[in-house]
Amino acid sequence: YIMYGGKVIWLIDQVFADMDSLNSKYNNNTILATAKDLNLDDQFFRYGVRFNKDLVLDLRSAPIPVVNGKYGTQVKTQLYPWPYFPFLFSKNDHPINKNLDVVKAEFAGSIDLIGSGEVKKTVLLASSDATKVMKAPTRISLNMLSFEPPVQQYNKSDIPIVVLVEGEFESVYKNR
């Protein structure tokens, strides 16, 4: 399909992390985010992209509600910024993302643009200028919300999260 000019949207999730598991009282609000082997690395490498087995954390992120007490019979919740839900920004005027506002991602991974000069690659959405990348496996805990984030560790910027790849693609099975 791709070799004959078909158009495909790939939504790749290289790391398993889940808020449902994180909210469980049985695991002390902690999970281990682990890498998934989707067996697609060769194909995407040939197309000029690498989906990294990591998580992008950003100080500019969406808040999550956290239960932090009770008021009588009412549960009291408060919103805390959750670095694992980064806001993504567009830095270009491509027709796909022109006039697009900030986009919220959940447990997003980074993408590297590599070699393969035959195809055109455009970063559609990227992280902010206050970003940190954590390789999988990594521990994720709601307890981190109790502390002020170490701002000096969020020293990366514009990490590609959404990429458009255009052109003519060769089969990953060619010459095999």
Regions found by a protein language model. Give the residues of each.
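Acidic, S/T/G-rich, low-cysteine, solvent-exposed domains in lumenal/extracellular/periplasmic regions
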Residues: 1-176
